[in-house]
Amino acid sequence: MSVRSLYGISGLRISTRTFSKTAFRLQEQVNQTQESTDTEINGRPLVPANLKNAKGERLMIPSKLQENALRNYELERLRIIPKLNTFYGGNPVHEENLNTLNGLIRKYINLPTRIVDDKEIQNTKFVSFEEYKTRIQSGTRLKPIHHKELTQLLHRLRSIDPELMPREVSDVLAKFANTSSESAKAAQKVKTLDEFGRAISLGKRKRSVAKVYLTKGDGQVMVNGKSLLEYFPKEADRRRIAYPFQVVSQEGQYNVFAEVQSGGSTGQAEAVMYGIAKDLVIFNPLLKSRLHKSGLMTRDARKVERKKPGKVKARKSPTWVKR
C-alpha cells in the first residue's frame, strides 16, 4: 500500500517528517557499515561522512598501515616473481643471453686469445637468425642487429685459446652452435703430452716432412738416429733448428728426437723447426703468441715451381735470336 492511499483513510494521521528522518537514519547506518568494511579490506582509514564537507576540520590519520598487512608472509610466498631479470625489457630472452655472454667476457678478460682461421669459421658456425628467432620466440621484436650483437660476443668468446678455455665457456658456445652443421663439423682436438711426457707434432717444409718428439732434458738433438752436428753440417741449418728455443729463451731445456724424410737439407731443417715450435706450444700454451709473432706457427708454403713446356726452367724463356 502506498503512502498516497493511506492519506485517503479517515482518522489516520501520518507524520511525513518522522518517515523522512527514519529513512535518512537507515541510509547513514548503511554508509557507516560500508565505510567500516572498506577500512577492514584496504587497511586504510577513510574520511568520516560528517567531515567530508566540513571546512577547517583537522583529521588525524595514522602514517603507517597495519602491521599485519605488512607481514603477510603467505602473500610473499605465493606472489609471482619473473624468472628473468630482464622480464620487463623489450626483448627479455635476448637481453638475458647478452647479459650472460658479457658476464663471461668480463670474467675471463685476462685469458690469452688467438686468431681464428677461416677454416675453423667455416666448420663451426653459430645459430642463424631464423633459428635464433624460433628458439627465443620473440617474434617481430628480434631484429638482425640483435643477432649480429649475439654473434659478435660469441666470436669474442671463441677467440680464447683452446688449451685455456674454461668449461662454462665451452658449454655456452655449444649451446649457440648451429645444430644443422654439427654433424659435418670436425671437433678440434687439443693436443696434450703422451703417457711418456712427450710432445709429438708434425712439421712440413717444401717436400720434407718431419715428425718431432720433444721432452724435458739438457739440450740434446737427434735427427734420424744421428747427432745434430753429424746430420746437419751446415751452420745455417743448425741455427734454424735452435731458433724456436731462442724465441722463448729456453735453450738447453729440452731434448729433440726427429724423424725426417724427403727434400733437401734446408727443407728438412725448417720442417724440424716448425715441429719444435708446435711441441713448445703443447708444453706451454702461453708461448703461442710469441712464437706466432716470430713466424713459427705458420709454415712457409712455398714450393719449387715446376718446369713448363717451351721454357728453359719454370719461367725462364730461351734466348731470342732474330735470325
Swiss-Prot record:
It is found in: Mitochondrion. One of its GO terms (molecular function) is structural constituent of ribosome. Its main location: mitochondrion. InterPro entries: Ribosomal_Su5_D2-typ_SF (IPR020568), Ribosomal_uS9 (IPR000754), Ribosomal_uS9_bac/plastid (IPR023035), Ribosomal_uS9_CS (IPR020574), Ribsml_uS5_D2-typ_fold_subgr (IPR014721). Residues 298-323 are annotated as: Disordered. Residues 304-323 have a biased composition (Basic residues). One of its GO terms (cellular component) is mitochondrial small ribosomal subunit. GO terms for biological process: translation. Keywords: Mitochondrion, Ribonucleoprotein, Ribosomal protein, Transit peptide. The keyword DNA-binding does not apply. PROSITE patterns: RIBOSOMAL_S9. Belongs to the universal ribosomal protein uS9 family. NCBIfam families: PRK00132.1. This is Small ribosomal subunit protein uS9m.
